[in-house]
């Protein structure tokens, strides 16, 4: 390296935790469903340089599972909440979103349908503009990518 040459600093790769219902993404064998909305969103984020963490394994149990989720939420720059009829009745999604709110994580709600939020965390999400993905896939992806670029520090 010659004198005076400035090396680029390694850029922090943005990391998001995906809070979702497995029923929206995985089949009964825990394999991703082809062409699922969740898969499309995950691929779009990854394709734009975002490190994505979502639980697709059913190998965790009880207390250990809670610790894995909590550690990954805390390690993320933001939480992308994939709101759907199924995720809004999920006990685990409720815990993830409530934990994220309690720990002041940036939350980006993405509405896969027009289901109202679970009352366990609806108040914590009030005032946060949701990406209304169900109104149009391309516009939804673009808004999510714009939101993640602006909100994730």
What is each of the regions a protein language model found here?
Residues 127-144:
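Output/docking surface of receiver
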């Amino acid at each position: 390296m010659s004198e005076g040459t400035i090396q680029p600093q390694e850029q922090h790769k943005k990391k998001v935790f995906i809070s979702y219902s497995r029923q929206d993404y995985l089949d009964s064998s825990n394999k991703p469903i082809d062409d699922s909305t969740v898969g499309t969103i995950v691929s779009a984020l990854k394709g734009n340089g975002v490190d994505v963490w979502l639980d697709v394994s059913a190998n965790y149990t009880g207390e250990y599972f809670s610790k894995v989720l909590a550690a990954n939420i805390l390690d993320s720059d933001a939480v992308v909440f994939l709101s759907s009829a199924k995720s809004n009745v999920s006990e685990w999604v409720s815990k993830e979103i409530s934990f994220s709110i309690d720990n002041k994580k940036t939350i980006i709600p993405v509405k896969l349908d027009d289901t109202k939020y679970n009352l366990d965390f609806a108040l914590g999400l009030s005032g946060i503009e949701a990406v209304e993905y169900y109104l149009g896939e391309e516009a939804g992806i673009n808004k999510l990518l714009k939101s993640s670029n602006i909100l994730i520090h």
